[in-house]
């Protein structure tokens, strides 16, 4: 079997010294077909599908903006419940400090969520999807920095894979790209930074429900003054337990109500803010003058800096604007923030500041104290509902991130259940759900007040925002057409502000600030260990792949039985024959009548059209009916159930055989193994049409497939009736004998402990046990 690509040491296709530079321009156009058995060339024949970035009408945009209010802005919208109490933990000594803090809140909200995220970060999306993984995937597609060496040149021909390369500053970008690709340390650091950010966001799935529900329920003290803080925490815990227990039902059926509830919440807090402003002190509007920030720090010094740990809570949930972008679009998120959230929360804070100028002693319960008596109970009910919705959004976000991490080989196997037929990103993970529930209950029971939880929450919020700043800076340098001046200003202004806030949050490390770091350290260790072994397991298969002549040798063996039916042999290896095949033949001297060696591969892209998913090739000799198949998914794609997957593979295999038969009769002779990409054959690009037209003009009889092709398709159809058997490798990974002590601990004990305590592959794929054959093999890495 002749491989179309030669893999270099870093897993990419070997090219000349100038090829990488030139390839940046060729990603945007389909390379003209040179030969019909070229996987690299044939991958470009399919027209791209529609992405999130496609232009939509204003009616659709406004509808999406309304939906985003309930999904994206619940967390940031509930911040007025606890910001002032978390900032003035020791009370208000000077009422002028209220103006200083109010000014800090105004310009923090304007600088980070509005300017940084709405106008800059949202542009760094991956075909309409956002979040840390989206940024990492953008950088990974532009520069080969993946730690798993399974890149193929044809990956760049996937429609959503294409990037707009910087034309006017391509030399600078190319120089940085080369440095990144040639630096193993940079690849590792970038990966660790990415999983640190994702770990922090997953940790928010613990902290957001705690602080949101606890602060909302705390308002009941205004009506039931006899309740102790412990009893209030108990009520919050009961609500949290119910919240996690209903996660398995998904939010599809009740999600439509999120928007109206959160919008009602914004109307309540904005209206209350206007009421308090005109009733108590309109002078707080002076806080729009940033001079009061300077006065505040001059007056309070170190204590002013420490209070920033509370101020930063006014932008909790900002990252959700970017992370949830895939469900909406950039314009909808921008409208939702600037038209609804921004004026509502600013009015809420201004109203509370006006109230505190008159009643500074009420700072611990500012929100509920400032509500007019007739609106108390309606506001309380809406506040609890809004807190639950904000918590729901972060829990769902944690599930989605873990699902993405698992797909990219960065998280142990867990069962991902899709709870919505409308939104592919809404998933439920039972194991993670109950872990989050236990952690939420424990944190709420131990800390009981929003002040201490806020100390932890602040670190998590700013840490993720700072990492986003670093990754977007890389995108600006390499991918965007951005001048060096703007590139320098972005991390200096936004990164500088975030570091100041982060330093303040770290000051309260011992008062709860350690929580997100402990969560993140544990998650990072699990993710890094799993990915480390995942990478080395792939490299083991790459080093030990079997000779291309192996199948030809099998074909002449007389004692090798051919079993009825079709066998799907799974391997991560995308090039060559995996070592598990000869191991299987040695233990069970038989092979199915049709054998498809399947590699399921995830690209650093959010989604792949079904018509671009399957790549096939023959393994010589053709008459032996052994095929290689690479099945490509994006990190947000839903994997089909076994029955649907089997049907798709077989139908695309038949289509491949038919197309290969047509191509093989053309004047372009096939050499070695024949390769085709399946899908979209009824709508080829002009290059394929030109080639086909030229071929047909020279040889009219080639428009009909050879007779053997129809026999082969009928044979596969017949074997399909005999059933499909899934052959899953059950690899026992151990450290090689000469490995150092630390590696043996990580591989032999830590990794294997994680593997045994998470789900096994067949439980993830739901393959029926009566059609599953597990093939055991030991890998020494």
Swiss-Prot record:
**Record topological domains on the Extracellular side:** 85-100, 209-225, 279-304, 356-381, 448-458, 503-512
> Which compartments does it reside in?
Cell membrane
Region annotation (Disordered) maps to 1-24, 681-707
Domain of life assignment: Eukaryota
Q: Does the keyword Transferase apply?
A: no
Give the membrane topology.
Multi-pass membrane protein
Report, from the record, the phenotype seen after gene disruption.
Reduced biomass of roots, basal nodes, leaf sheaths and leaf blades. Reduced tillering number and reduced plant height. Increased susceptibility to infection by the rice grassy stunt virus.
Q: What's the protein name?
A: Potassium transporter 5
Q: What GO terms fall under cellular component here? A: membrane; plasma membrane
Taxonomy, top ranks, is: Eukaryota, Viridiplantae, Streptophyta, Embryophyta, Tracheophyta
Q: What does this protein do?
A: High-affinity potassium transporter. Its potassium transporter activity does not seem to be affected by high sodium and low potassium concentrations in the extracellular environment. Invloved in salt stress tolerance by enhancing root potassium uptake and translocation to the shoot to prevent sodium influx during salt stress. Involved in the positive regulation of disease resistance against the rice grassy stunt virus by promoting potassium transport and increasing endogenous plant potassium.
The protein's annotated catalytic reaction(s) are: K(+)(in) = K(+)(out)
GO biological process annotations for this chain's record?
positive regulation of response to salt stress; potassium ion transport
Question: What molecular function terms (GO) are annotated for this protein?
Answer: potassium ion transmembrane transporter activity
Report TM segments: 64-84, 101-121, 188-208, 226-246, 258-278, 305-325, 335-355, 382-402, 427-447, 459-479, 482-502, 513-533
Q: What does the entry state regarding organ or tissue expression?
A: Expressed in root epidermis, parenchyma of stele tissue and primordial of the lateral root, root-shoot junctions and leaf sheaths. Expressed in germinated embryonic tissue, young tillers, flower organs and pedicels.
């Amino acid at each position: 079997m002749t491989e179309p690509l030669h893999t270099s040491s870093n897993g990419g296709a070997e090219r000349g010294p100038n090829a990488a530079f030139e390839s940046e321009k060729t990603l945007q156009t389909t390379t003209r077909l040179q030969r019909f058995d070229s996987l690299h060339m044939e991958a470009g024949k399919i027209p791209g599908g529609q992405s999130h970035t496609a232009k939509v009408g204003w009616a659709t945009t406004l509808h999406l903006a309304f939906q985003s209010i309930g999904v994206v802005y619940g967390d940031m919208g509930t911040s007025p419940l606890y910001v002032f109490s978390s900032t003035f933990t020791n009370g208000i000594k000077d009422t002028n400090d209220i103006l200083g803090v109010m000014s800090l809140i105004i310009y923090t909200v304007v600088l980070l969520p509005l300017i940084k995220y709405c106008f800059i970060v949202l542009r760094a999306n991956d075909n309409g999807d956002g979040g840390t993984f989206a940024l990492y995937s953008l950088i990974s597609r532009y520069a080969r920095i993946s730690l798993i060496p399974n890149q193929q040149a044809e990956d760049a021909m996937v429609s959503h894979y294409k990037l707009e390369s910087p034309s006017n500053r391509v030399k600078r970008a190319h120089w940085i790209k080369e440095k990144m690709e040639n630096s193993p340390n940079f690849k590792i650091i970038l990966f660790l930074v990415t999983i640190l950010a994702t770990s922090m966001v997953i940790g928010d799935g613990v902290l957001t429900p705690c602080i949101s529900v606890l602060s909302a329920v705390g308002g009941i003290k205004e009506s039931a003054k006899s309740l102790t803080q412990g009893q209030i925490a108990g009520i919050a815990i009961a609500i949290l337990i119910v919240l996690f227990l209903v996660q398995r039902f998904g939010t599809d059926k009740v999600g439509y109500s999120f928007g109206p509830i959160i919008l009602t919440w914004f109307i309540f807090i904005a209206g209350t803010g206007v009421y308090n402003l005109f009733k108590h002190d309109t002078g707080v509007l002076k806080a729009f003058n940033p001079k009061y920030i300077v006065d505040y720090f001059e007056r309070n010094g170190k204590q002013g800096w420490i209070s920033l740990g509370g101020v930063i809570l006014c932008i909790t949930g900002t990252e959700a604007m970017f992370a949830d972008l895939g469900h909406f679009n950039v314009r909808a998120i921008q409208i939702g923030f600037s038209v609804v959230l921004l004026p509502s929360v600013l009015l809420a804070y201004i109203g509370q500041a006006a109230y505190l100028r008159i009643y500074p002693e009420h700072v611990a319960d500012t929100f509920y104290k400032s509500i007019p008596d007739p609106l108390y109970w309606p506001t309380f009910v809406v506040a609890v509902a809004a807190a639950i919705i904000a918590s729901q959004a972060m829990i769902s976000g944690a599930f989605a991130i873990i699902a993405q991490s698992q797909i990219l080989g960065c998280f142990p196997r867990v069962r991902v259940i899709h709870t919505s037929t409308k939104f592919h990103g809404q998933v439920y993970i039972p194991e993670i759900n109950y872990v989050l529930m236990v952690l939420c209950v424990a944190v709420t029971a131990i800390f009981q007040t929003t002040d201490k939880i806020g100390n932890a929450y602040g670190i998590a919020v700013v840490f993720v925002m700072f990492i986003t700043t670093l990754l977007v800076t890389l995108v600006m340098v390499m991918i965007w057409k951005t001048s060096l001046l703007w590139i320098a200003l972005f991390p200096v202004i936004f990164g500088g502000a975030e570091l100041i806030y982060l330093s303040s949050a770290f000051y309260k490390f011992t008062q709860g600030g350690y929580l997100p770091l402990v969560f993140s350290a544990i998650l990072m260790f699990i993710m890094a260990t799993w990915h480390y072994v995942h990478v080395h397991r792939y490299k083991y298969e790459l080093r030990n792949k079997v000779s291309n002549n192996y199948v030809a040798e099998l074909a002449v063996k007389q004692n090798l039985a051919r079993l009825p039916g079709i066998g799907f042999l799974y391997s991560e290896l995308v090039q060559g024959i995996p070592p598990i095949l000869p191991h299987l033949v040695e233990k069970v001297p038989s092979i199915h009548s049709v054998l498809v060696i399947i590699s399921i591969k995830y690209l650093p892209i959010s989604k792949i059209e079904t018509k671009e998913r399957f790549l096939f090739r023959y393994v010589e000799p053709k008459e032996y009916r052994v095929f290689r198949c690479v099945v490509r998914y994006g990190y947000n794609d839903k994997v089909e159930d076994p029955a649907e997957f089997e049907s798709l593979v077989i139908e695309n295999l038949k289509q491949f055989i038919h197309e290969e038969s047509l191509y093989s009769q053309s004047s372009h002779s096939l050499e070695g193994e024949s390769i085709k990409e399946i899908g979209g054959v009824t709508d080829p690009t002009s290059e394929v049409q030109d080639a086909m037209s030229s071929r047909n003009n020279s040889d009219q009889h080639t428009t009909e497939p050879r007779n053997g092709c129809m026999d082969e398709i009928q044979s596969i159809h017949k074997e399909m009736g005999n059933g499909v058997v899934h052959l899953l490798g059950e690899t026992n990974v151990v450290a090689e004998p000469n490995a150092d002590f630390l590696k043996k601990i990580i591989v032999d004990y830590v990794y294997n402990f994680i593997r045994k305590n998470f789900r096994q592959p067949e439980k993830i794929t739901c393959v029926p046990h009566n059609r599953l054959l597990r093939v055991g093999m030991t890998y020494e890495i």
